[in-house]
Each structure stands twice: as C-alpha cells, then as structure tokens.
A protein has these predicted regions:
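Short, acidic/turn-prone active-site loops that include or flank metal/cofactor-
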Residues: 25-28
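Short, small-residue-biased leader/transition segments that mark boundaries at the very start
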Residues: 1-3
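Short acidic loop-to-helix transition motifs that present clustered carboxylates
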Residues: 5-7, 30-31
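Short Gly/Thr/Asp-enriched flexible loops that form oxyanion-binding sites at enzyme active sites
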Residues: 7-18
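Proline-centered loop/turn at the N-terminus of a beta-strand
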Residues: 19-21, 46
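C-terminal binding/interaction regions
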Residues: 30-107
C-alpha cells in the first residue's frame, strides 16, 4: 500500500463482504494520520485495524480467522501460540538467572 493510500482498507471494506485488515504505515505524524484514516469507518463498514507497521499481527489475525473453519490450520495456530509462550518462559528463566551487583550511593 502506498503511504498516501491509507484510505484503501476502507474502500475495500465498502466493496466486499469479506473481512478487511488495515495496517497503518508510519510516515508523517508517526503514523497517527494513517491510523485515523483506517479506524474512523462509518457504521456497517468495519476494518480490523492493526498497530502502526503491524503487518505481522495482520497476518496472524488472518490465519486465526481462516482457522475457525479449518481444524488443521487451527492446530498449527495453537502450536504457534504455544511456541511464543515457550519463548517467553525461556526468556524469563534466563533473565531470572542474571545477577547484578549494585553499589549503593548515599544522597
């Protein structure tokens, strides 16, 4: 999507009965202008709006939507989410093993 075309998810949503996912792109105004052009939709024209530059979450949301009608895809999504959980558990364990030495300074 072109930076100037952040209105396109709304145009597409108005033309199709299918779900539309909008991903605002960080350009001017830190992406706030893109967010507003995607999120401010009239009643009856919904667009699922992701975070600025949130294309990865857009892909994950699309897979979750498709998985509601596909047991194999749902199982893969469950495995993916479990792998994310395990990464966090591992990172927390590693972080808890880090030792710091502090020098207290009296004020």
């Amino acid at each position: 999507m072109c930076i100037r075309d952040s209105h396109l998810p709304g145009v597409i949503a108005a033309m199709t009965p299918l779900p539309v996912i909008g991903v605002p792109i960080k350009a001017s105004l830190e992406g706030f202008d893109s967010i507003m052009s995607i999120v401010q939709m009239p009643p009856g024209i919904p667009v699922a709006t992701m975070a600025v530059n949130g294309a990865m979450n857009a892909g994950i949301l699309a897979v979750q939507m498709m998985a509601t009608g596909d047991a194999e895809l749902m199982q893969k999504m469950i495995q993916y989410k479990e792998s994310l959980k395990q990464k966090i558990v591992k990172a927390n364990k590693e972080l808890s093993e880090v030792k710091y030495k502090f020098k207290r300074i009296e004020i």
